[in-house]
Curated annotation (Swiss-Prot):
This is N-acetylmuramic acid 6-phosphate etherase. Residues 57-220 form the SIS domain. InterPro entries: Etherase_MurQ, Glucokinase_regulatory_CS, MURQ/GCKR, Reg_chr_condens, SIS_dom, SIS_dom_sf. PANTHER family: GLUCOKINASE REGULATORY PROTEIN. The active site is at residues 85, 116. Pathway: Amino-sugar metabolism; 1,6-anhydro-N-acetylmuramate degradation; Amino-sugar metabolism; N-acetylmuramate degradation; Cell wall biogenesis; peptidoglycan recycling. It comes from Photorhabdus laumondii subsp. laumondii (strain DSM 15139 / CIP 105565 / TT01) (Photorhabdus luminescens subsp. laumondii). Specifically catalyzes the cleavage of the D-lactyl ether substituent of MurNAc 6-phosphate, producing GlcNAc 6-phosphate and D-lactate. Together with AnmK, is also required for the utilization of anhydro-N-acetylmuramic acid (anhMurNAc) either imported from the medium or derived from its own cell wall murein, and thus plays a role in cell wall recycling. A lyase-type mechanism (elimination/hydration) is suggested for the cleavage of the lactyl ether bond of MurNAc 6-phosphate, with the formation of an alpha,beta-unsaturated aldehyde intermediate with (E)-stereochemistry, followed by the syn addition of water to give product. Belongs to the GCKR-like family. MurNAc-6-P etherase subfamily. PROSITE patterns: GCKR (PS01272), SIS (PS51464).
Length: 301
């Protein structure tokens, strides 16, 4: 397949860095930093599309659906990174947010040649997950033309799922195929075609927003506290205690006691203290209010 890179923003040359190979190290890094500053502003222009995607993901979660990221190379790795942080941060099941990469798990560490060029592989990977209409697919590719991702997007649409994409080329096959196209224009890279740089940074910022926003919308955050955090190591055990203290203004002993009584479920401990009820009552009320702390507390008061 012949690929024309000439019209891709991510493949064009950046005049600002034409002489970067002649600069002293500090000046070189200042130039890279100056370009990086443009990324957040580019992402800002896409906030309405990001918000639309967040709401679709949150609705899918409420209906028992999943968020599936799919990409190749850096894009795939970033999706896997974001997905892998959801269980420890928000207490989600590993299958609720999943990252797929062209070439499978071995491609996380090493490039798998030609994997990204096969559309059918993208569809096959979704089929292996039993992807269905309740799920949301987010295709990730700086170029917006990766066949592996396009194949997955085509399959996802065929089963009636919501399909979004993140691409740094606004007029691309992916943006045309998606229901929701998130396309920050970050401009040419410092090193021509090195889309792991500004494009990758933009992707990471957007992925952060997608999962964080969806978790907030589904009750996983109270105030600005990660109240469903799982205590999987010593640091997170302490974080749980600090979250309970911050949310309730109780003392350390009270926080530890409440957490012990509810098997270390941070959200339940907070409701126990704020509402003055026991662990079972707190769990029952939280379930009734779909895991949201504020309406749970209001119902008691």
């Amino acid at each position: 397949m012949k690929i024309n890179l000439n019209n891709m923003v991510t493949e064009s040359r950046n005049p600002a860095s034409a002489n970067i190979d002649t600069l002293p190290t500090l000046e070189m890094l200042k130039l890279i930093n100056d370009e990086d500053k443009k990324v957040a502003l580019a992402v800002e222009q896409t906030l309405p599309k990001i918000a639309e995607t967040v709401d679709k993901i949150a609705e899918a979660f409420r209906q028992g659906g999943r968020l599936i990221y799919i990409g190749a190379g850096t894009s795939g790795r970033l999706g896997i990174l974001d997905a892998s942080e959801c269980p420890p941060t928000y207490g989600t099941k590993p299958e609720q947010v999943v990252g797929l990469i062209a070439g499978g798990h071995q491609a996380i560490l090493h490039a798998v040649e030609n994997a990204e060029d096969n559309q059918q592989l993208g569809a096959n990977d979704l089929q292996a997950l039993h992807f269905n209409s309740k799920d949301v697919l987010v295709g990730i590719a700086a170029s917006g033309r990766t066949p592996y991702v396009l194949g997955a997007m085509t399959y996802a649409k065929s089963v009636g799922a919501t399909v979004a994409c993140i691409s740094c080329n606004p007029e691309s096959p992916m943006t045309q195929a998606a229901d929701i196209a998130i396309a920050p224009i970050v401009g040419p890279e410092i090193v021509t075609g090195s889309s792991r740089m500004k494009a990758g940074t933009a992707q990471k910022l957007i992925l952060n927003m997608l999962t964080t926003g969806a978790m907030i919308r589904t009750g996983k955050v109270y105030s600005n506290l990660m109240v469903d955090v799982e205590a999987t190591n010593a640091k997170l055990v302490e974080r749980q205690k600090n979250i309970v203290i911050a949310a309730t203004e109780c003392n350390r002993e009270q926080a530890e006691q409440a957490l012990a009584e509810c098997d270390g479920h941070c959200k339940t401990a907070i409701v126990m203290i704020l509402a003055g009820i026991n662990a079972q009552q707190a769990k029952t009320l939280l379930k009734k209010h779909h895991g949201f702390i504020r309406p749970t507390i209001s119902a008691v008061r």
